[in-house]
Amino acid sequence: MSEKTENSGLSRRRLLQAAGVAGVVGAAAAAGSSGASAGSRSAVRQPFKPRGRLKRRPNFLIVMMDEQRHAPVYESEVLKAWRLANLPTQNRLRRNGFEFTNHHIMSVACQPSRASVYTGQYPSLHGVAQTSGAAKSAIEEDLLWLDPTTVPTMGSWFRAAGYDTYWKGKWHISNADLYQPGTYNPLPSYTDEGKRDYQLENIYLESERLAQYGFEGFVGPEPHGSNPLNSGSSGPGGRGRDEVYAQMGVEQLQKLRNAKNPWLMVASFVNPHDITLWGDLTLASDLSGSQGAFYLAQQLVGSNVPTDLFTSAYQQSANEDLSLKPTAQGSFVNQYPQGFQPLRNGIEYHRFYYQLQKEVDKHIGTVVDALANDRNNYRDTIVIYLSDHGEMLGSHGGMFQKWHSAYDEILKVPFIFHNPTLFNGAQASDILTSHADVLPTMLGLAGLNEAVLAKELTNTHTEVRRLVGRDLSSVLLGEESAATFNSDPVYFMTDDQPFKGANAVSALGIAYQPVEQPNCVESVVTYLPTGPAGSKERWKYNRYWDNSQTWTTPGVQDVQTFVPGPVNKPGNRVAVTTVKAVNPTTGQTAPPADQFELYNLTVDPTEMTNLYTNSASSGTLKIMQVILQEQRTAKRLSPVDQPWADGSMRQFPFTPN
């Protein structure tokens, strides 16, 4: 039997799926049930109990951005006014929404953060700790993706509860691309002009690359790499993937107009991530008009983004002396031109970042409009707006993107819940929240019991653990004051090392070294009663360390060989090999000592003054050290421990390659 049937055009697999569902429905009917499908049997066991204005189990539309930070404190009044006038979709979501204004990510960069959001767990458990690009390709041995049989995703949780689940746009949690035979060249789903190729899109749809992760509807390739058409909007003439992702989102919403089951859809956009493409080399190619160049500066032609974007506090940060900060920060600044490209921290660079936000806001608006035009679905759907991480944009001594530090420019991102019925006007809270809270809160809003679903998911996943975040649904529904959660800390971790890998060669063909250790970071943010008359102040404590789990032999030793100079130049060169060990012997080195930062964010919101060695803050430091240890223990889970034959729980033994 062929994959396509002769008379219907349906794939054999989909016919089998339909037959399977029909069989389940028939069995359920024979048993006297309502005829629910296999995917919805859990939902039958968990009837929905209305809560205030939430009368029925909601649908969810997650709108995810890439690289959009929460507005920093040094924004000018002019920029604030511009955002209000030029980001209508974001402001529309706020008008009938609830915004958490102190929302923090769990990890960086794209892959670790996204895997964390959609599993509710940290990289220490799900294993997605590194980001492809720079020194690493998507197929390298030391770049691990999420295995579908380990930690369940949001799609798996909600499918177990009877939801239909869809993904449109950027994924970046597993290697979901289809490849052309004999190569690692991703199969495009568009023409050479950037137009949609529906036949190629259908191949992606039929392959169901995210089925094991609990989602359907993904169309690749992933939006990264050297092809300008794989950007958000920086292909020829301003074309890119975001426009297409919006179209796909609208098409899916139209199909869901009469959906029988509750549904969850992720509309995942690229921009303002295209800011990472800006630099001396890409701009030179852009302005020369060469074929295959990124369309960057040309997007600013006719742009109304102002030039006076920031107050003087930004310039103080951009000119900061990093010699008083952990050494990884200065090392990252020095290595950036080699790992990516030289970049001038100027006004046009800053304006481009906000122009990209305006561009993607338009595409998000297309999706939100499609939802709003369906009155019933709009009433029954909670829209969640968030970003995977922020962007430094040249602050703190000229740092770009999002690695090797834990400043608010990276950690704080937008987090908005929107629904025209649940939220009467704009509401906001400054309690500390985290990406770890997203999944538990959604389960809470859906009236789903985590323990019941977890028990079912253990049949298909090896690492079904308690979700480490909090259910904030009681705050959103007005049942509980946000102040109830005000003393809860948030935790952040990153082991991402973009300049360490097999492809550590600059655009000029020169080999470069990784960022100086210690460069792994873990942080805790909390409120403490250290202000006048015991008022609460927001504190942040960062630990920089050399995590031995990122070594070539995890927990034992790290062997690195560096051959300096141009990689394509013939002749002899001297290679230098270093061996770092937990217990070093002769000729080996020990890992460097940890380094720390302590900030009073209420007094010092731009994080310029490191109080770690300040004797007046020693009492606060001790408290923050305890909190970091507690948060690490509670949230930085490790792969477990499966029962052995005698019933005991033991760690899987590590076997070196």
PLM ranges: what are they?
Residues 173, 407-408, 494-612:
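C-terminal, low-complexity/hydrophilic appendages and adjacent surface loops
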Residues 1-11:
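N-terminal secretory signal peptides
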Residues 20-23, 48-58, 65, 70, ...:
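Long, internal low-complexity/basic segments
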Residues 62-65, 69-153, 157, 163, ...:
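Active-site segment of extracytoplasmic enzymes that catalyze sulfate/phosphate-ester chemistry
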Residues 54-58, 67-82, 256-261, 269-432, ...:
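Active-site-proximal cap/lid insertion segments
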Residues 10-28:
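N-terminal export leaders
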Residues 118, 214-232, 368-369, 402-486, ...:
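Substrate-binding rim/cap in mid-to-C-terminal beta-strand-loop elements of soluble/periplasmic
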Residues 119-241, 276-280, 288-291, 486:
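Catalytic-site neighborhoods of secreted/periplasmic enzymes
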